[in-house]
Amino acid sequence: STVMNTRSSDILKGPQWANVRALYKADGYAEEELGKPMIAVVNSYSTVCPGHVIFKNLSERVREGIQAGGGTPVEFGVIGACDGIAMGHKGMQYILPTRQMIADSIEAMAEAHRLDGLILLGSCDMIIPGMLMGAMRVNLPTILVNGGPSLPGRMKEGNPYGGEYIDHSIIQESEGALKKGLISEEKFKWIEDHAMPSIGSCAMLGTANTMGCLAEAMGIMLPGTAAIPAVYSERLSVGYKSGKQIV
């Protein structure tokens, strides 16, 4: 069979690279896996940011897709801070620098290990831009798989915006209404508990969803995938298809 010449094969073929193969085998990789394209799965999973909780399970489907496509997945993590949790206090000073840290991490890992392609798992404000910056630096085949938006909350009566649906952005507006005595504390608490009823990026026209749609328009995601809600099963199949496509 024909052996594909890749960046990773430059450090995996020949007796002079036995030490590298031994290290991968220590990770649990089989000999045959080391002759395939080595695809990075860049995972920003955490239980801090609701837009990133999904990646614990989604990354598994991505790895399965890479294997089905004839590649070998190599997963590593990057940070993913939540702008919403950091907002309104000193923590916000740390958010913008994380974009650079993410880009630096991707560049360092992809170049240090001579990886052949990237699957980027990210959803939120600084994470997608940081990932795209890192991908552009290394100039490798890249597909972004975002986590998708949260489902909206439902507020059948008393919605100050009208209509039936609400999202996380209504909470700050409601805080002002509470201070003015326009809504009760009970109503305010209800909004807090129901405005964001699932994991996913905040379901509003913010940076997270905007960057996801932009990445799709740029051709860095599979078509029609940016706005699939995080809790839909289709999200998992998108991960599999993206992993298979990158190879």
Where do the PLM segments sit?
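A short N-terminal beta->alpha junction/helix N-cap motif
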Residues: 7, 11, 29, 46-54, ...
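Residue-level signal for pocket-adjacent positions within structured domains
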Residues: 18-24, 43, 178, 196-200
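Short amphipathic alpha-helical segments with coiled-coil-like heptad repeat character
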Residues: 1, 50-52, 222-225
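N-terminal amphipathic/basic leader segments beginning at the initiator methionine
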Residues: 3-33, 60, 68
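Ligand-binding pocket scaffold of soluble enzyme catalytic domains
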Residues: 3, 63-69, 158, 165-170
